[in-house]
Amino acid sequence: MAGPRLPENCRPVDLEDGWQVQQEVSRRLALTIGGWKAALPGPGKLVVAPIYAPGISQQAAVLTRPGVDSVKVEPEIAYVVARDLPARAQAYSEQEVDAAVGSVHAALEICASRYLSLADLPFPELLADGLVNDGLWLGPALAATEAPAFELSWQIEGEPVQQAQARHPNGQPRAPLYWLANFLRERGLGLLAGQTVITGSYAGVLELPLQRRVRFDYGGLARFELSFAAARQP
């Protein structure tokens, strides 16, 4: 459920505050962290947030939060970790991180916020909220090595095919994964076997209707079909 901003005296004022609020939310929810979203950091931005295991789905029919009439998704590539990369003093090399990846998949990040409105929110407050992550749909394994760009197409049932030139925002799709492994290492957390990491949308945000089949083609790297439905109100 969405709500107002935190009380003014509780709002994070910088990135470290936002990260600490995010971590406290995870502790209080007490949900297993099934993965992470990440992107390379930039001026005034720290792009890292947990993806909770109950929100990760591989089913062709996906339930979203109740009370909505559409769903926002981001087309992504997902890395499933097969070997722990625990906290340690020494930095992980790219080769070590690559060796820990068990499989690479097409994925859709499901986006929604706990805030009623995102208008004019400073980045630390977005970070505290988990950067609008509301779950992850984990699709089929890629048929070839992930690419920095490809021709993305999708078709909503009953409508024409839509296309976009998909590009990874950081150029190298694994670059945020390498960064994340060492960010978590430094924070005493680490990546765990079985967790899934997404590293940025190839095509911004797509808004999809509920109760209609949608077919995706990741430029021949993966093809899949799914639909979304709103969960029942508790």
Give the positions of each predicted feature.
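Non-transmembrane, aqueous-exposed alpha-helical and coiled segments at domain scale
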Residues: Q233-P234
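Carbohydrate-binding surfaces in secreted/extracellular proteins
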Residues: F216
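Catalytic-core "active-site belt" of small-molecule-metabolizing enzymes
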Residues: M1-Q172, L177, E186, E207-P209, ...
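Short strand-turn-strand beta-turns centered on an Asx-Gly dipeptide
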Residues: I156-G158, T199, G219
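A conserved acidic, glycine/proline-rich C-terminal tail/linker
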Residues: P176-P209
